[in-house]
Amino acid sequence: MRRTTFVGLVPLLLLLVTGEATAHAFLDHAEPRVGNKVDAAPREVTLWFTQKLEPAFSTIAVTNAAGQRIDTGKARVSGNQMSVSVRPGGTGTYRVNWHVLSVDTHTTDGDFTFQVGQ
């Protein structure tokens, strides 16, 4: 009876372990928040992901309403967090584009917008 119980648990344990190992880094939340309206342009955009990131292969680009890139350069990555400094870009819709490589070697990307001063 004990052998049957153990054999029955093995597939369940494998499913749990491989489910975590194959997870990708998806956007968990951001500051400024996705779709939010803020009074003034932020000095920094920060994204948090569901997995740790590989710094050398993870990027953020921030553009203002005129489509001009206003981030100041390379993203800073620490664990599952990525941020970039932003120059003032006026009012309107800002777009954040991101591309990340998680430590599980899978890439994900996406974008979102937020409003400044409208």
Language model segments and positions:
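Short, exposed beta-strand-loop hairpins at the edges of beta-sheets
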Residues: V86, N97-D111
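N-terminal signal peptide c-region/cleavage motif recognized by signal peptidases
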Residues: T18-E20
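Short strand-edge motifs at loop-to-beta-strand transitions and within beta-strands
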Residues: N80-V84
